[in-house]
C-alpha cells in the first residue's frame, strides 16, 4: 500500500541504492531542465518497479487463498518518467486538449482552473508556459507512465500464469480519480468533467465464473460497486450497509432489473478552517 506507506519504503530503497536527495520530492525532478527529460532514477528503480518487485517477492511466500491490494501511485503528479518511458511517445502525436466556449462555462470553472496549473504537474518548472506544446509534452509523459505500469502488470500476470494461478485469480483494475491533462484548460482532479472522474474499471473473473470475456458494459457504475462485486464473486454475503451494487450479473451477461440510471461523484470544494480557492472566490 504505497499511499499509506507515503513512499517511505521506496525512499529507503533509493538511499540504499546510493541515490542522493534530502527530501523525496527532489527525486521527482527530471535530470535536466526539460519537462520530458528522464527521471533521476532508472526504470528498474522506479516506484512502479519497486512495488511490483515487493509484490512478487511477497506472493512467493503466500499460500493459496491470498489477497493483494496493490496501489500503484503512478501515473500521478508529479509527472516524471524514467527512460525509456519518458520519450516512448511523441508529444506531437498526443490528442489535442478539449476546449470550452465562454457561454458554456460554469461559475466554478475560473477558480478550478487556478487551483492547479501545468507547472503544478511537474517539479522544478515554476515558470512553465501554459500552451499547447506544454500540454502535449505532459500528456506524452503521462502516457509513458501508463506504458510503464502496463509492463509491470504484465510481470504480475506472467508470474500468475507460471505458478498456474492466473485462471483462478480475480483481478480488478481501477483508479481513484482521473486527470484533466489540460482539457478545458484544467489540470489535476478537482473538476466535474469526465477526465477527472470517469475512471477505468476492468475485471478479470476467475475461470469458474461462466461468462463471455471482453464484455464492455455501457450501463452506469460507480467505485462503490467494486466491493460488493468482489464479495459476490467470492460467494461472500454482501452486508446490508454496503451502498454499491454487484456487477457480477453483467459478467454473466445478465443485466439486473432496475439497474441504476444515475451515479454520484463528489468533490469537496470547502474547508471549515482554511478557506479554499472556491470559498475565497465566491465569498463563502
Name the predicted role of every residue range.
Residues 1-43, 83:
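Catalytic-site neighborhoods of secreted/periplasmic enzymes
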Residues 2-14, 45-103, 149, 161-170:
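Active-site regions of oxyanion-processing enzymes, predominantly non-cytosolic
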Residues 9-13, 177-183, 227, 232-284:
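C-terminal cap/loop subdomain of S1 sulfatases and analogous C-terminal strand-loop tails that border
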Residues 27-70, 81, 124-125, 133-144:
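Catalytic-adjacent loop/helix segments of enzymes that bind and process anionic phosphate/sulfate esters
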Residues 44, 107, 139-147, 191-197, ...:
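A short beta-strand-to-alpha-helix junction
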Residues 67-74, 170-175, 202-203, 246, ...:
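Short beta-strand segments
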Residues 72-77, 94, 129, 134, ...:
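Short, solvent-exposed loop/turn segments at secondary-structure junctions
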Residues 78-81, 159-213, 222, 272-274:
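Histidine-centered active-site microenvironments of extracellular/periplasmic hydrolases
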Amino acid at each position: 500500500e504505497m499511499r499509506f506507506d507515503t513512499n517511505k519504503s521506496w525512499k529507503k530503497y533509493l538511499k540504499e541504492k546510493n541515490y542522493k536527495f534530502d527530501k523525496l520530492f527532489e527525486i521527482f525532478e527530471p535530470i535536466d531542465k526539460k519537462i520530458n527529460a528522464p527521471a533521476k532514477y532508472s526504470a528498474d528503480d522506479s516506484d512502479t518497479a519497486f512495488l511490483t518487485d515487493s509484490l512478487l517477492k511477497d506472493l512467493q511466500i503466500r499460500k493459496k487463498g491470498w489477497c493483494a491490494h496493490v496501489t500503484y501511485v503512478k501515473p500521478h503528479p508529479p509527472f516524471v518518467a524514467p527512460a525509456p518511458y519518458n520519450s516512448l511517445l511523441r508529444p506531437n502525436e498526443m490528442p489535442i486538449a478539449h476546449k470550452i466556449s465562454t457561454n458554456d462555462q460554469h461559475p466554478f470553472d475560473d477558480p478550478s482552473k487556478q487551483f492547479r496549473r501545468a507547472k503544478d504537474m511537474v517539479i522544478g518548472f515554476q515558470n512553465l508556459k501554459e500552451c499547447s506544446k506544454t500540454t502535449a509534452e505532459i500528456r506524452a509523459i503521462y502516457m509513458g507512465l501508463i506504458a510503464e505500469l502496463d509492463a509491470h502488470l504484465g510481470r504480475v500476470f506472467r508470474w500468475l500464469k507460471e505458478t498456474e494461478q492466473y485462471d483462478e485469480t480475480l483481478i480488478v483494475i481501477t483508479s481513484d480519480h482521473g486527470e484533466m491533462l489540460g482539457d478545458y484548460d484544467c489540470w489535476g482532479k478537482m473538476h466535474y468533467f469526465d477526465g477527472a472522474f470517469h475512471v477505468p474499471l476492468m475485471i478479470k473473473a476467475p475461470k469458474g465464473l461462466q461468462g463471455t470475456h471482453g464484455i464492455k458494459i455501457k450501463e452506469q457504475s460507480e467505485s462503490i460497486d467494486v466491493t460488493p462485486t468482489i464479495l459476490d464473486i467470492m460467494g461472500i454475503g454482501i452486508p446490508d450497509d454496503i451502498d454499491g451494487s454487484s456487477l457480477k450479473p453483467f459478467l454473466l451477461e445478465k443485466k439486473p432489473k432496475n439497474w441504476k440510471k444515475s451515479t454520484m461523484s463528489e468533490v469537496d470544494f470547502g474547508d471549515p478552517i482554511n478557506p479554499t480557492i472556491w470559498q475565497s472566490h465566491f465569498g463563502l
